[in-house]
Structures are given as C-alpha cells and as structure tokens.
C-alpha cells in the first residue's frame, strides 16, 4: 500500500528549486535540506562541508563533505579515488571488473600493443580520479584514442578556479608529479602520470545507490535513445547481494554509487552476473532527483538519520519528505569586504523567484562578519546557503556560514 504522502503528492519529473543547480552540488544541498528540516544548528564551510551540531546524545556533531557522511573513512574514499587499488580489491573479493591496465603517457608502444590485444571500443579514465564521480570516455578507434589522450594530458585550468572547489575531490591529494610546459605555453601532466584503459563492457547499465549497506535505489541508463538521464527500476533489493559484496571489498565507506553492467534487469542479480564498471563515494543524487524528487530527498534524509543519534529526528523523520518552511538566523564570517558581499548577495537574490525572504541584520567590518535571516522552504534556504558558501552565482564568498 502506498504511503499517504505518495497519494497526496503525484510523482512528476523534477522542475523545482534545484533544476538549474550544478549536479556536483546536489548531494550536499539535499543533505543540508535534510539537516534544516530537523532544525540542527549548522556550519557551512568551503568544499561544501556542512557540520550539524547536536544539543545532546553520545556525539556532539555530524559532518558531511559533498554529501558524503563523516562516518566514511579517509582511507576508504582514497581507495575509491585510486582505481588500481579499487579494481584489485574488487577482484580479490570475486567481483568481475572490465579487463584493464594503467599506463603512463610515455608508454605509447605498450598502450598500442595492449589495445590491439583486447580490441576496441575501450574506456579511458584517469588512474587517480581527479573529479568527483568522473566516468571516463569511450573510444572506438586509434584516431579517437589519440585525440582523447592528447586532451586528457592537458592540465585543465578550470581545476584551479573557484567553481572547481565543488567539482574536485576534496578528501586527499593523491598525486603531486610536476607538470611540464610546451613551447606553445600549454601546461601538460607529467609523462609519468598514469591513465587507465579498460575494455568497454556492452549490456544494460544499472546504477545502484547504497546507503549503509542497503540498496535504496536502482536506476537504468538507456543507450542509443538520445536520452541522457536515468530511469528508476522497481525492486532495487534484487541487487542487494552485489552491493553487499562491493561494501565488503571496499571497507570504510558508508555511501556508494555503483555502476554495473548486466544482461537483463528483470530478475535477481548476483555478483557473478554483473560487471562492476565504476564505484564512487558520491551518490549522484541529481540522477535520482529528476525522475523522483521525493525519492532523492528520502535518501538524503535516510543518510542523515543514519548519522544522527538524536531523538528529535526520530520523531520528525516520517514528515521529512514534505517541503517545510524555516526561519534561520545566519552569520557569514571571514569576509574581506562586507559591502561587496552584500552587494553580490543582493544581486543574486534579485534573480530568485522562489518565495525566499532575505533580511539583513548587523554587520561588523572589523571582524568581517554579516548577520542575515532567511525565511522560506527548506529547499530554497538550502539552495541559497550552498550558493553563497560554494560561490555558485556569487563571486565573494565567506570563510564560513553559521546557521542558528
């Protein structure tokens, strides 16, 4: 039987507050919204880190980075960033992964021999994940391969822009090889920098969203349809065995986004009936948000629920999917120019038509602090706060934002 909220709120494709938000920020914005709904005092920091402070209980705070809970270990997410380590761990636990090997940019002959052996198409990825959740490029012939490798080796200056703060991996620096500069002034990655070549695996692509060991969502990605999104699959528990095996192989990570390839999506799937093509600690909830905003928010609430040992949340969790209104006093800290910050925020606020109310309070130019109040739905407040903290639409960013 459907829950009452499912009957009252018909399912539709998402066209709400986050429709034009960068996909890299969606996980963190949904987590912030879930925290706002239970009225925890918050602190928003650079790299989309949000800390919720608990008034009582065995722990005093909970933290999330890009939506990844603090209960995930640094070692666990670093293993995921190093695709060689991740592949080895999965294979050690009996999981199928695409045939593949890593090469440096100076190993041109070895790469040609290897691809000649496994055949096209192949998938090219960084050996160390540079951006959150990047999935690689499929190439079908030698000409495409040369073009992709040439493009991949160029150091992308956007990696060092303010906007890259919410795209780049924020957990650990996994490679510090010096770059080289061509006669034309183009900066290239070191010739010893490594990339991964994997055999492309045909079949039905399925994405599993796993929270604390349970598959909470399964999505399929149609191929050759012109549609770039995902479709929800019924009965995600069919993939539970696969998720459990991957979690066993990659300890220390509480949330996982697992991409697999299967022959069909109709029946139960075991670890021997699929190929693991990608794993990320990021859930990529933007892929869930557009087919089902309700489910995406439910998943974010379940992540918070698993992190927070707090009786107040237990009393409210059944209502966590409704768009509730909040009034939140806020304090922006670490501002170099308070007047410029206010000007930028007012300009950004004027472009919003979401019913959000912004009220400026006291400011302290000496301390670099400004107080303001936000009134509106939790999704609108979360969107606005994350925009200010991450520099999305606002060029002047505070060092932190306290939410009371």
PLM region descriptions:
Residues 132-134, 202:
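Domain-scale recognition of functional cores that engage charged ligands
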Residues 136-141, 210-211:
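Short beta-strand-to-turn element immediately C-terminal to the catalytic PLP-Schiff-base lysine
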Residues 122, 216-217, 275-278:
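Protein kinase-like catalytic core scaffold
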Residues 11, 224-404:
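ATP-dependent carboxylate activation and anion-phosphoryl transfer catalytic cores
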Residues 150-229, 234-238, 246:
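Phosphate-binding site of ATP-dependent enzymes
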Residues 104, 128, 199-201, 262-264, ...:
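Short, flexible loop/turn elements at secondary-structure junctions
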Residues 3-119, 129-132, 376-404:
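Conserved N-proximal alpha/beta basic substrate-recognition cap immediately N-terminal to
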Residues 41, 205-207, 259:
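Short, surface-exposed charged micro-motifs
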């Amino acid at each position: 039987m459907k829950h009452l909220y499912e009957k009252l709120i018909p399912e539709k494709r998402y066209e709400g507050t986050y429709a034009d938000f960068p996909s890299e920020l969606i996980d963190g914005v949904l987590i912030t919204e879930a925290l706002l709904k239970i009225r925890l005092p918050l602190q928003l920091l650079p790299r989309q880190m949000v800390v919720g402070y608990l008034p009582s209980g065995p722990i005093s705070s909970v933290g999330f980075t890009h939506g990844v809970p603090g209960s995930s270990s640094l070692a666990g997410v670093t293993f995921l960033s190093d695709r060689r380590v991740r592949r080895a761990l999965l294979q050690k636990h009996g999981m199928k992964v695409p045939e593949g090997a890593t090469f440096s940019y100076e190993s041109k002959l070895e790469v040609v021999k290897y691809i000649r052996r496994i055949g096209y198409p192949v998938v090219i990825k960084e050996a160390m994940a540079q951006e959150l959740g990047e999935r690689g490029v499929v190439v079908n012939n030698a000409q495409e391969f040369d073009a992709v490798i040439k493009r991949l080796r160029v150091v992308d200056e956007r990696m060092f822009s303010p906007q890259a703060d919410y795209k780049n991996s924020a957990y650990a620096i996994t490679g510090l090889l010096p770059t080289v500069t061509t006669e034309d002034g183009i900066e290239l990655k070191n010739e010893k920098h490594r990339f991964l070549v994997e055999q492309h695996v045909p079949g039905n692509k399925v994405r599993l969203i796993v929270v604390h060991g349970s598959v909470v969502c399964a999505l399929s990605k149609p191929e050759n349809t012109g549609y770039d999104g995902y479709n929800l699959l019924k009965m995600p528990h069919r993939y539970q065995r696969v998720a459990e095996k991957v979690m066993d192989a990659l300890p220390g990570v509480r949330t996982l986004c697992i991409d697999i390839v299967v022959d069909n999506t109709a029946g139960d799937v075991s670890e021997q009936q699929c190929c693991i093509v990608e794993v990320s600690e990021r859930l990529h909830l933007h892929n869930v948000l557009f087919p089902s905003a309700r489910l995406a928010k439910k998943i974010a609430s379940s992540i918070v629920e698993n992190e927070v040992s707090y009786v107040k949340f237990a009393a409210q969790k059944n209502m966590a999917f409704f768009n509730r209104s909040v009034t939140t006093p806020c304090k922006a800290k670490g501002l170099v120019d308070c007047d410029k910050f206010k000007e930028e925020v007012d300009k950004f606020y004027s472009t919003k038509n979401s019913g959000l109310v912004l009220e400026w309070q006291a400011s302290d130019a000496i301390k670099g602090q400004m107080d303001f109040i936000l009134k509106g739905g939790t999704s609108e407040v979360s969107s606005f706060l994350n925009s200010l903290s991450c520099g999305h639409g606002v060029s002047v960013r505070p060092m932190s934002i306290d939410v009371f």
